[in-house]
C-alpha cells in the first residue's frame, strides 16, 4: 500500500478498528478515513453507496460488525445474522463497484464446526455442524469470507478474509450483557473487588462510565446491588457462566492490528492457497497464537492481577459454548507473522488500561 493511499477503516472506533488505525498511523500512512455509526449506518445501503461515491477509498478494512458474548448471541439471533450480512454485503459490494484495490475482511473463528479437530485448520470450514449458541453470527461470517473468495475467483479482485481468535485490548466492550468473556470477567471481578473493599466511589464511577440496565452511579445503593447481583457480582463472590472447563485462545488486539496491516502490505489472494489447486476454497487466514487457557484459569489469572480476595464460582446450569477452540496458526506463520504478547502480559496490560481509562 502507498503511504498516501486513502484507506477506509470500517469500525475504526471499535476494539480492532481503533488498533488498526493506530498501527497504520505509526507506520506512516497519512490518508485514513472512518465514520462513526452515527455518521454512517453500514446497514443503510444507500448511505454506504453515497460514502463510497464521495470518498473513493483505495483500500478498505472491514472491521465493523455486530458482536457479543454467549448471552447476546443466544438471545438476539436474528440481529446477529441480519445485521452482519447487511454490513458485509453493503461494504464489500460497494468496494467492488468502486474498484477498491484491496480489501481485508475480519471474521471470527466461530466459523469452525463445534467438533472440529483441534487445532482448527482453515480446511475445517463447513465440515460438520456449528456451535448452536452462535450459529447465526457464524453463518454471517462464513458468508462474508465466501463473498470475498467468490469475488476474487470471478472478478480477479484482491479481497483477503482473516479469522481472528478471541480478541481483547484497549477500547474493548465491557457491557456486562454483550461483552466477550475476558472483558466481562475483568469488569465483574473488578466490581466485586470494589464491593468487597467497600469502595463505593469507584463502583459509582464505574457505573457512570458504563451504566448497567439503566443503573448508574446516581442510582440508589439497593438498586446497584440488585443489578450487580443479577450478573453474579456480590461482595462475597463472582458467579461465572458454565463449568470453567472450556479452553479458549486469546490475542491482544494491537497484535491483531499488526497482523492485519502485515497482510495488507505483504499478502495477496494468490498467496492464500497452494499453486495448482483445482478447487480453490478456504483461502481465509487464521490470526491467532496457537496457545490456550481454561476459563477457570483465566478467571484466577484476573483474580491475581486485580488483587480480588473473594470467591469465584461457576454455574454449570449456564452454557459453556464450544468446549475447545484452538486455531492452527501454520498458514499465518508461513506467511511471515508471529505473535509476541502472551495472555499473562495481556491481562496485566488490559487491567491497567481499564483502570487508566476510568481516570480519564
Report each predicted region and the residues it spans.
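Hydrophobic positions on the long internal alpha-helix
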Residues: 87, 91-95, 147-148, 259, ...
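Short-chain dehydrogenase/reductase
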Residues: 81, 85, 133-145, 175-183, ...
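Conserved Rossmann-fold NAD(P)-dependent oxidoreductase catalytic core, especially the SDR/UDP-sugar
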Residues: 89-134, 160, 173
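C-terminal substrate-binding subdomain of Rossmann-fold SDR/epimerase-dehydratase oxidoreductases
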Residues: 11, 15, 19-27, 191-360
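NAD(P)H-binding glycine-rich loop region in Rossmannoid oxidoreductase-like domains
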Residues: 45-85, 94-97, 109, 114
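SDR active-site strand-loop-helix element
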Residues: 10, 35, 60-64, 103-109, ...
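Active-site Tyr-X1-5-Lys
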Residues: 132-165, 181-197
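Adenosine-cofactor binding site in Rossmann-like domains, unifying the SAM/SAH pocket
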Residues: 25-50
Amino acid at each position: 500500500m502507498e503511504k498516501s493511499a486513502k484507506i477506509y477503516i470500517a469500525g475504526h472506533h471499535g476494539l480492532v478498528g481503533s488498533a488498526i488505525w493506530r498501527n497504520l498511523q505509526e507506520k506512516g500512512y497519512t490518508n485514513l478515513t472512518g465514520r462513526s455509526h452515527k455518521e454512517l449506518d453500514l446497514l443503510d445501503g444507500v448511505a454506504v453507496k453515497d460514502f463510497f461515491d464521495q470518498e473513493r477509498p483505495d483500500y478498505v478494512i472491514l472491521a465493523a460488525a455486530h458482536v457479543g458474548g454467549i448471552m447476546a448471541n443466544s438471545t438476539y439471533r436474528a440481529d446477529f445474522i441480519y445485521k452482519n450480512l447487511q454490513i458485509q454485503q453493503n461494504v464489500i459490494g460497494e468496494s467492488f463497484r468502486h474498484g477498491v484495490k484491496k480489501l481485508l475482511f475480519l471474521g471470527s473463528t466461530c466459523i469452525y464446526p463445534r467438533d472440529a479437530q483441534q487445532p482448527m485448520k482453515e480446511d475445517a470450514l463447513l465440515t460438520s455442524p456449528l456451535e448452536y449458541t452462535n450459529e447465526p453470527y457464524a453463518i454471517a461470517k462464513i458468508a462474508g469470507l465466501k463473498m470475498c473468495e467468490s469475488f476474487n475467483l470471478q472478478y480477479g479482485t484482491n479481497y483477503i478474509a482473516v479469522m481472528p481468535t478471541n480478541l481483547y485490548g484497549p477500547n474493548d466492550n465491557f457491557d456486562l450483557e454483550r461483552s466477550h468473556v475476558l472483558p466481562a470477567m475483568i469488569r465483574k471481578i473488578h466490581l466485586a473487588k470494589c464491593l468487597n473493599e467497600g469502595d463505593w466511589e469507584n463502583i459509582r464511577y464505574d457505573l457512570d462510565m458504563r451504566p448497567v440496565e439503566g443503573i448508574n452511579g446516581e442510582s440508589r445503593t439497593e438498586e446497584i446491588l440488585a443489578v450487580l447481583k443479577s450478573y453474579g457480582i456480590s461482595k462475597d463472590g463472582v458467579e461465572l457462566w458454565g463449568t470453567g472447563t472450556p479452553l479458549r485462545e486469546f490475542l491482544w488486539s494491537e497484535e491483531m492490528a499488526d497482523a492485519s496491516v502485515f497482510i495488507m502490505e505483504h499478502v495477496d489472494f494468490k498467496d492464500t492457497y497452494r499453486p495448482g489447486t483445482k478447487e480453490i476454497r478456504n483461502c481465509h487466514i487464521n490470526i491467532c497464537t496457537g496457545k490456550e487457557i481454561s476459563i477457570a484459569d483465566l478467571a484466577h489469572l484476573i483474580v491475581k492481577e486485580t488483587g480480588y480476595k473473594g470467591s469465584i464460582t461457576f454455574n454449570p446450569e449456564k452454557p459453556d459454548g464450544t468446549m475447545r477452540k484452538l486455531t492452527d496458526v501454520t498458514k499465518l506463520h508461513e506467511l511471515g507473522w508471529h505473535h509476541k504478547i502472551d495472555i499473562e502480559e495481556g491481562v496485566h496490560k488490559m487491567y491497567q488500561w481499564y483502570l487508566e481509562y476510568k481516570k480519564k
